[in-house]
């Protein structure tokens, strides 16, 4: 099919392999072209190649390749949204890369300008998916983040969530209950297979005076106190 290729900057972009770039239109610093992909059924190992050449004082940024029929202004791939239809709630543990997260400071969080697999998906995109689908959401706050991170996270969602859009999406989906946003302190802090267990156990041992009398495991006291701290922030 024919894909849309969009990029910014004065560098050079070329396409090879199973792709052919044509009909490039320059709109100032933004460049738009069409890429025809030709894949012969039964052939394997054939790849699309996109080569970027940056000269002095020239660079290419914001390169996007859109499948046929996809609106470049859309935040999410339509088949992805369609796959979410059966569900009433979305848990974002993996999107937030919660297990084993090393995030501490808000400045180190993934942003829409810079993100990959290591620290998860930007909170702005999580909020946008909630806005678009109207589904209840379950957030998991990484274990090591400081109070400022938690406060900034709350402010971010307060600003990014559009409750008018959420309600419209819920009405369209036939949801009759109010929207709910669940916030969990990390994930499975009782599970010794995750680093959060050691994090909370160390915190509990460091502050024995906060012990509440919980006897269901060494993780219990500070997990509860950690939840209380999280809710206060």
Which residues make up each language-model segment?
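Non-catalytic accessory regions flanking glycosidase/transglycosidase catalytic cores in CAZymes
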Residues: 1-185, 190-233
């Amino acid at each position: 099919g024919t894909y849309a290729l969009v990029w910014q900057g004065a560098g050079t972009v070329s396409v090879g392999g199973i792709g052919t770039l044509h009909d490039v239109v320059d709109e100032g610093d933004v460049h738009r072209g069409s890429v025809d992909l030709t894949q012969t059924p039964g052939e394997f190992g054939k790849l699309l190649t996109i080569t970027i050449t940056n000269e002095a004082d020239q660079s290419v940024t914001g390169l996007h390749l859109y499948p046929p029929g996809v609106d470049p202004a859309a935040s999410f791939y339509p088949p992805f949204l369609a796959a979410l239809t059966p569900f009433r709630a979305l848990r974002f543990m993996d999107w937030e890369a919660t297990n084993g997260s090393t995030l501490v400071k808000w400045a180190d969080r993934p942003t829409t300008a810079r993100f990959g697999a290591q620290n998860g998906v930007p909170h702005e995109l999580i909020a946008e998916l909630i806005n678009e689908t109207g589904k209840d959401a379950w957030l998991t706050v990484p274990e090591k983040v400081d109070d400022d991170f938690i406060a900034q996270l709350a402010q971010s969602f307060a600003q990014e969530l559009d409750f008018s859009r959420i309600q419209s999406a819920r009405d369209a989906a036939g949801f009759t209950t109010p929207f709910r946003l669940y916030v969990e302190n990390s994930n499975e802090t009782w599970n010794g297979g995750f680093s959060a267990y050691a994090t909370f156990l160390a915190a509990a041992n460091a502050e024995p005076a906060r012990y509440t009398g919980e006897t269901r495991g060494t993780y219990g006291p500070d997990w509860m106190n950690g939840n209380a701290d999280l809710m206060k922030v």
